[in-house]
Amino acid sequence: MPIEGGKTDMERIGLFSEMEYITVGDKYVSPFNRPFNEAASKNRQILPGGTKEMSSLQAGYFDSQFARIFEGEGYVNLNQVRRRYMLAESKKNLGKAFIPSSGEKKPSGLGSYYGTIGGPVPFFSAQIKPKDKYQPPGKNLYTNPGKKGTGYGYANVTIGKQLSHSSDLYDAARQSYKKESEEHHRLIKGSPFKLHLHPKDYFDTNPYFLEHHLPPLRREEKKEVSFKPFKPSSPGKKAGGMKAGAFDPYPAHSADPYVVKVEKAIPSKGERVFHPPNGPKSRPVESIMALNVKRALNVKNYKNASSTTLGKQLVF
């Protein structure tokens, strides 16, 4: 049986069925003596049915005979059908319309005053109330005539009075400065104060002068520098995965696999997909029309060839 969705080897080659093996001593079996249903003779009864083809026969239907829908029916009047339906519905009425014993209930929702203490208030009624005729009020009193502008082009239109013009001296600043300097010189008494002693600086002229002597200098001892090559304490490590000179020891062998293989889940008998056994393959059959007309045209008989000798069909 092939894999899921695969083909057999014979189907890949393109043959209808595998050729039969002829052995010495086997009897000849005529095709007329072969069973009609070869699969049934080999105990292969569970075979799926093939696809249904559309035809005018009754073989593919449940009923053995085609039944017409409106066979033997008379003309139907739609108005008569409606009247019969209305009459049948009217018979379902038992009597008069049902009236409850307690009467109709009044609503007590928004806009209803049923169940309240005072009832509706006439002030909040939605009816239009009569109103007096509207009389517009009179004009306001004028205490001062209107202004003629913003004040840029008109005189005496602001709240305050108009500023009067006053002329200033050309060199008023120089004259005021002159008066202040004369008053300052008047307050100065005599020449500046001068000391008769020899002047001295605040600090000594020698910036390195010290009262106490400094201690003697200490010379640092110089270490002798050795130019010997550096030698490591242990030999060099060898590359290539060798652990002889490494810091860590060689890891111990472990039987754990590097990658854990995921085992394939083997489905049980009930979970497997049912594949019916393949039926018998068809064999290549020659046409009956060409059995008696096969003739060959070769080098020897091509001169004497005719339609009577070769038949209607010539095979090259």
UniProtKB/Swiss-Prot annotation:
Its main location: cytoplasm. Residues 220-242 are annotated as: Disordered. It comes from the Eukaryota. The keyword Cytoplasm applies. Pfam families: CFAP96-like. Keywords: Cytoplasm, Cytoskeleton. It is found in: Cytoplasm, Cytoskeleton, Microtubule organizing center, Centrosome. InterPro entries: CFAP96. Residues 227-237 have a biased composition (Low complexity). One of its GO terms (cellular component) is cytoplasmic microtubule. The keyword Cytoplasm applies. Coiled coil: none annotated. PANTHER family: UPF0602 PROTEIN C4ORF47 (PTHR31144:SF1). Belongs to the CFAP96 family. This is Cilia-and flagella-associated protein 96.
